[in-house]
UniProtKB/Swiss-Prot annotation:
Source taxonomy: Bacteria, Bacillati, Actinomycetota, Actinomycetes, Bifidobacteriales
MF annotations from Gene Ontology: deoxyribonuclease IV (phage-T4-induced) activity; DNA binding; DNA-(apurinic or apyrimidinic site) endonuclease activity; phosphoric diester hydrolase activity; zinc ion binding
Gene field: nfo
Keywords assigned by UniProt, alphabetized: DNA damage, DNA repair, Endonuclease, Hydrolase, Metal-binding, Nuclease, Zinc
GO biological process: base-excision repair
EC number(s) reported in the record: 3.1.21.2
Name recorded for this polypeptide: Probable endonuclease 4
Record has Glycosyltransferase as a keyword: no
Co-factor binding details: Binds 3 Zn(2+) ions.
Amino acid sequence: MMELYIGSHLSTAGGWNALLERSHEEGGTAFAFFPRSPYGKRSKALDPAGAAAFGARLKAEGYGPLVVHAPYVYNLAGKDEAKRTFAIEALAEDIELLTAIREAGQEVYINIHPGAHVGQGTETGCRLISEGLNQVFERTTGVMVLLETMAGKGTECGRNFEELATIMNGVENKANVGVTFDTCHVLDAGYDLVHDYDGVMRQLDEAIGLAEVKAIHVNDSQFGLGSHKDRHANIGQGQLGIPFFTRLVNDPTMAKLPMILETKEQTPTTHRDEIALLRGLVD
């Protein structure tokens, strides 16, 4: 039986030790967190001096890769040059913080929403994202950046595999960029994971390469195929359903990757229960 690296997106309140205790409470072996406020510029109270010890402890406890989530406010594709510059500088700072974890032996990625072109057009948006990442990697290359598959709402870039491939092809340091596969977003974007799982995986492999997928956001979908809504549902309570998640956790290529739950906490034990549910689906 394959052991899943799985957990949820956790609060950093209380610092590194409190973060790990929350993971223990839900029975996780991987998790995500925001390195600073997800909606604003204020940094969270994570002591850089404690990062290395945190990484060493995770490594000793056998954790899978961390999938840290960059703040939503970052928009590498935006019209405003000052905001793009902020995103570049802040993302580089986040990577520097996380590099200490990686250097302690614990694998860690930082996941970003690629960005929204806000009316400039997809081609311009994808180019700006690539250029922004190139500037980030001129400053630091300590941690791989993962581009998240998007649902396609508004003017999001990365709404299909080809757009993500375009962004990645524009990055000079290709070893530093990969993909996070969000199950809700992929279905909402129009890929039929329920009835054509193998076909979707072939499309992903042809456009990007399965080897470039480094993490999974494990979410059910409220609205489903082609809705472009980006509304997560709890596992088994949406349009993807338990048969899809059974297929996912028994797919040798995907099941070895860190899986991060971003579902709503309906009760204090929601994520603990969902982690147990997904582990119970493994053959």
